[in-house]
Amino acid sequence: MTRWVQTFLLLVAVIRSYAEDSCPDVKVIGVGASDKLTILRGCPGIQGVPGPQGPAGPVGAKGFAGARGIPGDIGPTGLKGEQGYPGARGLKGEKGDPGVPVPGTAQNCKEWLDQGVTISGWYTIYTPNGLTLSVLCDMETDGGGWIVFQRRADGSVDFNRDWNSYKRGFGRKDSEFWLGNDNLHLLTATGNFQLRVDLTDFSDKSTYASYSNFSIAEESQSYTLSLRSFMGGDAGDSLSGHKNFSFSTKDRDNKSNCAHTFKGGWWYETCHYSNLNGLYLHGNHTSYANGVNWSTGRGYHYSYKVSEMKFRPQP
């Protein structure tokens, strides 16, 4: 066989092979000649152009939270903010129980007495606002424990003074003094206190008067005197008539010019039943009611030798 014939036959075989793989089969269905149906399967067509993108589907369900990551580094400190406005003031709390005094300190002479101090004299106490104050403690009269805030004894100190002097206090520890209206208010503002007035005439006869619930108001209320009742005493009651009266001095006379007329600061109205801050006149005097007077005692024409006003916690 010649060479070109061999080549031709090989080419036909290859073409036939491609035709069998790429062209569809021919199938005949049916038994009889009239029932036979020829089915020709076509070749696959060329891939068409992609259609337009369809609409987005509905949002899927939220997935589970992932694992927490590693904390990052702390950032730098921010700038300090501006100070805010003060808040509203809260309601006042209920009054607490009295505190237990620290050994070696006291808030009044009664506490010193309870710690074993029995000798009268000047002692340091702590006021309710934490300040210290030197006071004369009477540890002998009627059981002791008294803070003495007024004393007349020899006429060495002038008691016809102005408002600020009575406010701050004045005098000498070894003779006559007034403890000060600010101090009186501070020491009597909380608690219940008993007031005692001790009087001694120039015959050295001593008498007294006692009162319950003594206190002095603050300066804005003109140091008004508060008392509840006369508790007794052979000097008689010459102070109940002054309760709820304002304090007056020669430069701030709150009632009827009494302080100017009777020469001393006191709780006046029109004008007085007593005035232990008047002139020191050595017993009997002809002038009217301007001495160290206690009307239910020796009257308006007798000036006492010694007077002391004192208070302590009420039993």
UniProtKB/Swiss-Prot annotation:
It is found in: Secreted. Residues 100-315 form the Fibrinogen C-terminal domain. The keyword rRNA processing does not apply. A carbohydrate binds at residues 270-272. GO terms for biological process: complement activation, lectin pathway. InterPro entries: Collagen, Fibrinogen-like_C, Fibrinogen_a/b/g_C_1, Fibrinogen_a/b/g_C_dom, Fibrinogen_C-term_domain, Fibrinogen_CS. GO terms for molecular function: antigen binding; carbohydrate binding; carbohydrate derivative binding; signaling receptor binding. Keywords: Collagen, Disulfide bond, Glycoprotein, Immunity, Innate immunity, Lectin, Secreted, Signal. GO terms for cellular component: collagen trimer; collagen-containing extracellular matrix; extracellular space. Residues 1-19 form the signal peptide. Residues 75-99 are annotated as: Disordered. Pfam families: Collagen, Fibrinogen_C. Strongly expressed in spleen, liver and heart. Also detected at lower levels in lung. Residues 42-99 form the Collagen-like domain. Glycans are attached at residues 213, 244, 254, 284, 293. N-glycosylated. The keyword Nuclease does not apply. Disulfide bonds join 109-137, 258-271. NCBIfam families: GGGWT_bact. The fibrinogen C-terminal domain mediates binding to carbohydrates. Belongs to the ficolin lectin family. Homotrimer. May form higher-order oligomers. May function in innate immunity through activation of the lectin complement pathway. Binds to GalNAc and GlcNAc carbohydrate moieties. This is Ficolin-1-A. It comes from Xenopus laevis (African clawed frog).
